[in-house]
Each structure stands twice: as C-alpha cells, then as structure tokens.
Amino acid sequence: MQSETLLETLQNLPDQSGVYHYFDSRSKLLYVGKAKSLKKRVKSYFQFTPTLAPSPKLSPRIHKMISEAAFIRYIVVENEHDALILENSLIKQLKPKYNILLRDDKTYPYIYFDENESFPRLEITRKILPHKGVRYFGPYTTGARELLESLYELLPLVQKKGCLKAQKACLFYQIHRCLAPCESKISKERYGEIFKEALGLLQNHSKLISRLKERMEKLAENLRFEEAGELRDRIEKIKRIEAFSGIDLARLEDLDILAIATSGKHSMLTRLFMREGKVVSSTSTPLKAQEGLDEEEAYRRAILHYYDSFMPLPPKQILLPLELESKRELEAHLEGLFGRKIPLHHPKQGSKKALIDLALKNAEELLRLEGEKEEIPLLESLQELLGLESLPRRIEAFDTSHLRGEACVGAMVVYEEGFCKESYRRYALEGRDEYSQMREMLGRRAEAFDRESPPDLWLLDGGLGQIRLAQEIIESLGANVEIIAIAKEKIDAKAHRAKGAAKDILRTPTEEIRLLPSDKRLQLLQKIRDEVHRFAITYHRQQKLKKDRQIDLLEIKGIKKGKLKRLLDFFGSFEAIREASFEELCKVVSEGEARAILEASF
C-alpha cells in the first residue's frame, strides 16, 4: 500500500455522491463502490495511524483488498441513485477482483398473448412489448418452448402468426390442427372457449402432462414410436417446471424469492419465481467473491444485476432471508425502473417464510452438487497451475482463419460447464495479417463488455505476442480478464498444427508451461482450442464459398479477374461494390462493365 498516494487522495475527496475505484500498484482494478459522500465512505476503509492501514472493522475480503490498494480514482455524480446505476454498470463491464460477481444469465422467456386480438395466439418473448393489453406468463427458466408446442398440438389454435392475414385455410386445417378462423369456419366465441382451455392447461401443468400422456399412449398404440418418444422427452421437460408448482399461496401473489447458501469459498444464489400464487420456475447461479462473501452486498448486487426495465412481468414483492441496510435505496431504484413500488420483504413466519426456507434449501443442495462436479477440482487445479486470481468457470477462446489474405474471419467460442453455443460469435475481419486480425477481433469483443460481461479467462491461439496484444486491449478498458495462450511447439522454426507432429505449450504472461499429453488440464484447453479452430475454419469456408460464387457470377457477366482485383482494391469488399452507383463503378471499369455489375445479383 503506497500511503503517500492514498493519503493525498483521501485528503482531497469531495463530500459528494459518486463512484470510487481501487487499483493495485500495477494499475489493476481491485474494487468498485458507490457512496452518498465519497469523503466519508472512502475514508471509512482506513485507520489513520502514523502509517495508513486498513480499518479493523472491515470484512476479511475488503481488508485484503485495501492492503493491496495503491491508489484511488473516483467519479462525481448528481446523486446517490446515479451512483448506484453507475456502480452496477461498471462492475458488470470491468469485473473488479474483489467485487461480488454474478454470472450474466440470459433473459428468461415469457409466454404471452394479446387480449386485443379476436383470435389470439400464444407466443414467446424475452422483453416487454410496447402495446397495451398483453398478458404474460412466466418467467420460464426451462420448458417454455415445450409448453407452447404441447398446447398447439393438443388444441386447434391459430398455428402461425400470418395465418389470419392469408384469409384462406391452410395445411393445418386439413390435418385438423386449426379450425380456420381465416375463412370464418369458427366463431369468435367458440374459439374463445378453446383458448380459455389452453390457458387453463398452461397454468395447470399436471393436467397438461396427463393430456400429453394420453396422446403419447395413442401414438405408441399406432406404432408411431418416434413421435411417442419425442412426446415423452417433452413431458420430462415440463415435469421440471412442475417440480415446484405444488407450492401454493392462498392469495394469487407475484413474488420473487432470493436466497444465498455459502460453504467455504463457494456460494450459490437461488431465485424462485412465483406468479399468481404458484412457483412457476427457479434458477441458480454460483457467486464469485475473493476471500469470503458479504451477504448484504451479495443481495444488493443480485437485485441490481437481475432487475431491469425490460422485464415483462416484474414481481409485486421480493422476499429475502435478511433485512438489507440498503433497502430504501434499492426500493427507490426498483420504483424508478417499473413505475411502482416493489417492496423488499424479510418474512419471519408463515407461508412466505416457508418460501425463503425452500429457496435456501435448494441453494444448499445445488451448492453441494456444485462441489461434487468433476470439473470443479479440474478448474481449481488449472487455476493453481496458471496462477489465476479466480476460478476459470467461463472461458472465451479466439482464433482467426484466412487463405492468403482472403475471406479473413475470426471466431470466439465460450466454455462454461460445456460449450455454450448460443454465446459463440463470428467476426468478418478487415486486417491482412494475423496480429491485426486478432487485435480487431479482441477489440470488438472488449467493446461489447457492457452488453456481454467479460469472462474469467481468455484463451488465445499463439504465444507471448498475442498475450501482450490482448493485455493492451484489456488494460485500456480497465477491465479484469486473465489471459493465456496455447500453441504447438516449433520444429525447424515452424509450428505444426497436425496432430502428433508437435506438443502443445501453454503460455501465461510470465512463464511457459509444458504438460504431458495425458494431463487433464491440458486436454481441457486443447478441447476448447480445437473447437474454436473448427468454428473459425467453418466460417472461413462459408465466406470463401460465398466470395467464389460472387467472382464466378461477375466473370460470367464479362468482368475478368484483373478488373475484379481493381474493383476490390478500390471498394474494399463485394458489399461495397454491390452498393456502388453507376458513376462510382465507372471510375474503375468501363460503362458496359458497370452496367453488367449493376445487373448482376451477387
């Protein structure tokens, strides 16, 4: 701790609301916090002895953070609410070492229908819709698609969004899956009765499962075993939603229940979603915190992290197993988001206390199962081997691909308890060499940290040069992402990708690590590297094929390769050539060739 630097800052702190950042001696971000008064809050971390020292009142985690702190930076804002918003945004983007971090869960789907429609349909959305008269059901952490498919299979609802516009009965009418309201073959009143039945099944999963089982048995009797098997799998997924639906409140309340279980260094947050008196779904996520968990801060972070104005069906109340000191400011924040009060309630008895107990029980069980996962010891061993500050639960790997500078592309894959294919990203790159391509790709990924939070670890295909390049990008943003690389050892000054030709070498910012081929840690990183290489190659081939087709088409139109090269050099891409005007094309080719290009569909 550099006392002079810190002391100078502490003596000049303003008595205003703001957000403060602690950094270590290497300018690495340690912690982000907010304050009603920067002067009072930041000073509370210290005791002013002859040498500046951490306050004895601090938790072990924050005490350790202060002992590593070298300097402080701060941002002044208008009020405490603005400080709260900015703090939450910066923690999501920068992932400071000592803040409590939550995984970015995807937005959960809701099932909805529009009450204004004469013949309504059930559909899925992940965000609030702009018009009035929309009724939502959910959120569903699993099984939303299966619920919808089941209802459309069991009942003759309007199957597709565009059906009514067609004004003509389609195939669904012929196979008895729709009653053709488009041709007025069913009245609005009769359709309303069928739709009411669908809503009843949507809200009573036991009854829905019973109907699906009857259909499954009929399919099996008719030797339609494949369809019966698909229905069986769908029933199993709906049963997972059903797991909590036996819990019922006498009043039809909309509640969210949050609970955190902690064991040693590991913590688990569980959320139960109750709508109209029934628990409709649940989700859990591990929490990351260096040197122990502060429960007050953890619940505050969870509320700020998971509740935003795009939520279609916010709860009427949030239940917590403790009374939060920051309750008033959080309730004011929620009221600002949703335009109504959402109380944070700590029930001490009754049915709501039972819901808290249930959430805690689930958090404890999931934490136990998390500790038993085979991958956790492997990740802990990898953390120790690579000298990482946190467990590498979420790993992003990058690779580029091109053929002599053509169809330059990049790819990113994500590994978190397996490959997360919905998080994969592809990049069309403009750089002509591997370093500029990697810089462009990593820069674009880093710029998206505000929308998609940073991972624990970046895995690059290369060596120290690639690591330093990535470090520049991360440090320029002040984010916390650890970086390693993997590459084939060089034989005759060449790196051989072919399997068996050379061993893989791991590289951290400070050392080179060689492991036996049988080492599970190496095999995990190789598996991730091979997946991103496959993903990049596949995208490159698609782009190359597209480009070859464009070249072939233009050659058919009489544009020779020499002219094509001049066009690409001048415009930069086929997209730019396609969008160019006749006058712009004539700067490079003849008028006849310009007309041929404008007529070509490439």
Curated annotation (Swiss-Prot):
One of its GO terms (cellular component) is cytoplasm. InterPro entries: GIY-YIG_endonuc, GIY-YIG_endonuc_sf, GIY-YIG_UvrC_Cho, RuvA_2-like, UVR_dom, UVR_dom_sf, UvrABC_protein_C, UvrC. SUPFAM superfamilies: C-terminal UvrC-binding domain of UvrB, GIY-YIG endonuclease, RuvA domain 2-like. Residues 206-241 form the UVR domain. Its main location: cytoplasm. Belongs to the UvrC family. Pfam families: GIY-YIG, UVR, UvrC_RNaseH, UvrC_RNaseH_dom. It comes from Wolinella succinogenes (strain ATCC 29543 / DSM 1740 / CCUG 13145 / JCM 31913 / LMG 7466 / NCTC 11488 / FDC 602W) (Vibrio succinogenes). Keywords: Cytoplasm, DNA damage, DNA excision, DNA repair, Excision nuclease, SOS response. Residues 15-100 form the GIY-YIG domain. The gene is uvrC. This is UvrABC system protein C. It is found in: Cytoplasm. The UvrABC repair system catalyzes the recognition and processing of DNA lesions. UvrC both incises the 5' and 3' sides of the lesion. The N-terminal half is responsible for the 3' incision and the C-terminal half is responsible for the 5' incision. Interacts with UvrB in an incision complex. The keyword rRNA-binding does not apply. HAMAP family: UvrC. One of its GO terms (biological process) is SOS response. GO terms for molecular function: DNA binding; excinuclease ABC activity. PROSITE patterns: GIY_YIG (PS50164), UVR (PS50151), UVRC (PS50165).
